[in-house]
Amino acid sequence: LKDKKRIAILGGGPSGLFMFKRLVNTGNTDLSITIFERKNKLGSGMPYSAEGANDEHITNVSGNEIPPLVTSLNDWVKTISKDTLDKYHIDAARFNEYKVLPRLLFGQYLTAQFDLLQKQARETGVTYHVRYNTTVSDIIDRPEKSSVIIETEDGEQSEFDHVIICTGHNWPRKHEGSVPNYFDSPYPPVKLALKLNHPVAIKGSSLTAVDAIRTLARYNGTFDKDKNGKLFYTPFASHPDFKMVMHTRNGMLPAVRFHLEDSHLLNDSLLSKDEIKDHIKANDGFLSLDYIFERDFKLPIQEKEPEFYEKIKDMRLEEFVDNMMALREELDPFLLLKAEYAEAERSIKHKKSIYWKEMLGVLSFALNYPAKHLSAEDMQRLQHSLTPLISIVIAYIPQSSSEELLALHQAGVLELIPVGEESMVEPHEGGGAIYNYTDEHKNEQSVHYQTYIDCIGQPHLAFEDLPFKSLIEKRTVTPAKLKFQSADEGLKAMNSGKPVSKDEQGDYYLKVAGITINDNFQVMDAYGSFNERIYMMAVPYIGGYNPDYSGLDFSEEVSGIIIERLMV
């Protein structure tokens, strides 16, 4: 084994699956791969296992949007037992790749793909070892030996040449457990199997909030269909005061999933990596947000939707966002949901995209990788302006979830309150939380909810939250930061209390979430040198440099970037 390249994959969820696929597909028998998995099963990770889903939770992607694995979802569905199909109300004969499916079932698919890849590895002579029920407690870099030590919770140490961190989602607990009925996230959803006779506060309206709503609704009432096939909800008579109240900054619901023309978010019209490199070189070493907005959003729209293009061609980014948000703000969110549901239904029926929405998803994906080259000024613009619109429009809430939200609202058990930018939540020692906010009429509100659930989705974690302490102590990793293009703007931001630092050259830097990585997802140290041995694929720790990540597409793309570098 000594002469083999020893590679550790930390985490056997979807990211680990795509990384393992890349390694196995090389057919390289000079590799020795070890997968460390905290649980007793590979593939499903958090979102597609009981840690992140119950039977009622569905994916927001369909088979045709999943990057290729070993077998297609369509073919796999034909191989599963009738009991499983019946449990999830799936007819294998009528199943097609355009349908979303239950998350737990999708988790089984990912596990099956991992099994097939292991079989492939055995057949091609690629050495691998899976360490189930193993938690990695530390990563110790040994540059002098060109190796990395992985330490597990039981104190055991193993040496590797390369480590790829694929640890997936992480929701730190702040008050959950010490404050009754206060939840830092809705996961695992089994904890929300609660019968409640009071209003429940839900922070956020993202897909994470929809997960919480789907679970709570089932424990406090029933869904049925009327004679026209329309869904309606009846709360239990014993719970007359049960209600769910979503709180959002802008009082908006996510947009409804529609037919995507290019299901993998990789559009032919996008700027190439070389074009982006050339642009950065010509622009003082910065990527311009306006340039990306013109080239990766407006131009493709000109060809596909010339009428829409005429409306937006002279708009700057902020103006475009304000325009789109204003359209959403004018309408009651549930009326808008109803209208978008009908529009999305037509889009799916006729397999015709809603092109500007699709391109917004493409723009978000295209911005993700080079975002670390934005100036601090442009990153602030992105976070303040574009990100809120993107998070609403490309959430792609599935049809059945839209139907449930509309039925719950009609039954009077679901409402949405806009709370603005300055709202604050305080845990209440008796249970739940106090929601402090300014309402639409500029009145200060302070409302106690006996149950509170934070549903804003995966937070971008701070540098200090990285669980592998030796990486921080030995300065193997460093906090992510972005340079200000203008020193005046940097000074202004520093004086206004933003996390800004100044170096010896007089340049100003904005601290952003997570750690510093390069374009190959290698971690970087305090001196700006990249590490040949350690790769970071765990999205919660690179949020500053990767502001948007699109699940499986992200795993597919990044594993491809890493394998190129590993196999040099």
Task: Describe the function of each predicted region.
Residues L1-M46, A50, A93-V568:
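Flavin (primarily FAD) cofactor-binding/catalytic cores of flavoenzymes
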Residues A50-D75, F242-K243, L265-S272:
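N-terminal glycine-rich dinucleotide-binding loop that anchors FAD/FMN and/or NAD(P) in oxidoreductases
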Residues V61-A112:
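Conserved N-terminal/central alpha/beta ligand/cofactor-binding core
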